[in-house]
Amino acid sequence: MSNKTKGSTLERYLVSRLRDKGFAVIRAPASGSNRKDHVPDVIAMKSGVIILIEMKSRKNGNKIYIQKEQAEGIKEFAKKSGGELFLGAKIAKDLKFLRFDELRRTEAGNYVADLETIKSGMDFDELVRYVEGKISKTLDSFM
């Protein structure tokens, strides 16, 4: 299975899991396409809370890099949409989510997450609870 196919499979799996948790979600893959604008791989919304997820997968290894141009593009998308940007990182069988501001910026302007930072990220259920904790509850919702 090619890396592109593995990435697409992972993105579809995430979309399905988010949908099962009540999110409105779309997959917007752009890698390998001729798109000039950069968009995150997954856009998910729940009760007005928007999360944007750039997915990266590694069989093993200790770092995940995002090139400067791609990072700046998806950060701009996040700013325009009002969404919160995350890196979804799958290393071996673990799937973790990091807020994009947790990534370190290199001297060349690229972004990197080392293995320790990735391991400290949220798992899927923690990500869902994080989003649900941001949903505003009004008095009407309790009646």
From Swiss-Prot:
Q: Is-annotated flag, keyword Magnesium?
A: yes
User: Looking at the Swiss-Prot or TrEMBL record, what is one Pfam family this protein matches?
Assistant: Hjc
InterPro entries given in the database record = Hjc, Hjc_arc, Restrct_endonuc-II-like, tRNA_endonuc-like_dom_sf
Record: active site = 31
Q: Which GO annotations describe the biological process of this protein?
A: DNA recombination; DNA repair
Site feature: Transition state stabilizer? 56
Which molecular function GO terms apply here?
crossover junction DNA endonuclease activity; DNA binding; magnesium ion binding
What keyword terms does UniProt attach to this protein?
A: DNA damage, DNA recombination, DNA repair, DNA-binding, Endonuclease, Hydrolase, Magnesium, Metal-binding, Nuclease
Q: Which residues bind Mg(2+)?
A: 11, 41, 54
Instruction: Give the first-level EC class, as a single word.
Output: hydrolase
What are its E.C. numbers? Answer: 3.1.21.10
Which reactions fall under this protein's catalytic activity?
A: Endonucleolytic cleavage at a junction such as a reciprocal single-stranded crossover between two homologous DNA duplexes (Holliday junction)
Q: What happens when the gene is disrupted?
A: Not essential, it can be disrupted. No change in sensitivity to mitomycin C. Double hjc-hje mutants cannot be made, double hjc-pina mutants grow more slowly at 55 degrees Celsius (versus 65 or 75 degrees) and do not grow to the same cell density as wild-type.
What's the cofactor?
Mg(2+)
Per UniProt, the cofactor note for this protein states:
Binds 1 Mg(2+) ion per subunit.
Q: Relay the record's extra comment.
A: A second Holliday junction resolving enzyme, Hje, probably with different substrate specificity, exists in this organism.
Q: What does this protein do?
A: A structure-specific endonuclease that resolves Holliday junction (HJ) intermediates during genetic recombination. Cleaves 4-way DNA junctions introducing paired nicks in opposing strands, leaving a 5'-terminal phosphate and a 3'-terminal hydroxyl group that are ligated to produce recombinant products.
Family named by the database record? Belongs to the Holliday junction resolvase Hjc family.
Subunit and partners: Homodimer.
Spell out the protein name for this chain: Crossover junction endodeoxyribonuclease Hjc
Originating species: Sulfolobus acidocaldarius (strain ATCC 33909 / DSM 639 / JCM 8929 / NBRC 15157 / NCIMB 11770)
